[in-house]
Curated annotation (Swiss-Prot):
Domain notes: Contains an N-terminal DNA-binding winged helix-turn-helix domain and a C-terminal regulatory domain (or effector binding domain) resembling phosphoribosyltransferase (PRT) domain.
Entries under PROSITE patterns matching the protein: PUR_PYR_PR_TRANSFER (PS00103)
Protein name: Transcriptional regulator GfcR
Record key words, sorted: DNA-binding, Transcription, Transcription regulation
Gene3D superfamilies in the record: 3.40.50.2020
Entry GO MF terms: DNA binding; orotate phosphoribosyltransferase activity
GO biological processes: pyrimidine nucleobase biosynthetic process; regulation of gene expression; UMP biosynthetic process
The organism of origin for this protein: Methanothrix thermoacetophila (strain DSM 6194 / JCM 14653 / NBRC 101360 / PT) (Methanosaeta thermophila)
CDD domains listed in its UniProt record: PRTases_typeI
Protein family (similarity comment): Belongs to the purine/pyrimidine phosphoribosyltransferase family. GfcR subfamily.
Keyword flag Zinc-finger: no
Cited Pfam families: Pribosyltran (PF00156)
Length: 203
């Protein structure tokens, strides 16, 4: 995306295709608050937008070759933390949607199993209150030591949710690994965070 107008247009298109604001925020790598603003206030500019940064990592994501190299670098960083803290890993948990391709390559590099977590923001239900869950098509996390992999930390809520979900199922989260951290944080819910890039606002 090159401008705020591009973001408004893309957010509006995705909304018209039936995506929820949480799903749109995942696609555009901005917070849900920013999506709400883009869809309701941006064109009128009556309310200032939230402070956020749009991240477009599609040049990496559209190439399995590039993504594999990024996953290798992230894997090395994960091993550094695990070694330093004398921790182990059984399962890499990818956060859907955009964290899954990266997580599958990290799991392959590490030689461990793969699980997929669907966060609440990916659920759309009018009948019941949505909540995140693990796909049953992948590894079981019960009693296992895990690393969570996602693409971007925007607010940290999705990863807090994932850690709590895994904890409720008897899993232990030892590391959270992301491509880009827009919060500049060292840990989430007491779990160390490693990122290839930290983006920190200075204003």
């Amino acid at each position: 995306m090159k401008s705020i107008e591009d973001l408004i247009k893309k957010a509006t298109e995705l909304k018209s295709e039936g995506l929820s604001e949480g799903q749109i925020s995942e696609e555009l790598n901005v917070s849900r608050e920013t999506i709400t603003w883009l869809l309701t206030h941006a064109e009128r500019a009556t309310v200032p937008g939230p402070k956020d940064i749009s991240v477009d990592w599609s040049m990496i994501g559209r190439s399995a070759y590039r993504l594999s190299h990024i996953a290798q670098a992230l894997t090395e960083m994960i091993f550094d933390i695990l070694d330093e803290k004398e921790l182990d890993i059984d399962i890499v948990v990818g956060v859907a949607l955009s964290g899954v391709p990266l997580a599958s390559m990290v799991a392959d590099h590490m030689g461990v199993g793969l699980a997929v977590y669907m966060p609440t923001k990916q659920m759309a239900s009018q009948d019941v209150k949505p909540h995140g869950n693990l796909s049953t098509n992948f590894s079981d996390v019960s009693g296992r030591e895990c690393v969570i992999v996602d693409d971007v930390i925007t607010s940290g809520r999705t990863l807090e949710e994932a850690v709590a979900y895994l904890d409720d199922r008897g899993a232990k989260t030892n590391v959270i690994a992301v491509l880009i951290d827009k919060k500049g944080i060292d840990s989430i819910a007491g779990v160390p965070v490693c990122s290839l890039l930290k983006v920190i606002r200075v204003n």
